[in-house]
């Protein structure tokens, strides 16, 4: 993953630098999965996906908003648009301003799951408000979570040990154990 400054990363990159970096990573033969930002440029997104798939590399198409969370219907539409690119995994991470926006993120994933979506989703509400999206994903169709083994790389990340404990507890509740 190379996260551009526009989506919360630390470094600026021109579109051609961003494209070249991703293509070099794909062509290196050393990666299994690459993350391409949905709003970088559709031509680049399409090109990266095609190259990655031709080399047997999986693709996460992602969108990050560190300022706010869009309404639930727009989250669903954005996920559908990301899925339509041919992404192997669709990811949206947004910053909630209130608890109802966290619920919107989870409900959007659940709605897609109930409509038969087969593309794995990564659904994250960042910050302290959004911690539950990192721990209860199994309940609403989130397939991946992120934790920290040290310094968090995004707001709201919890330690690996805390996440493991929470995921185990939620799984046992769902499984009726």
Residue ranges and their predicted role:
Residues 1-54, 64-68:
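Active-site beta->alpha loop and helix N-cap motifs at the rims of alpha/beta catalytic domains
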Residues 38-177:
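Catalytic alpha/beta core domains of metabolic enzymes, predominantly
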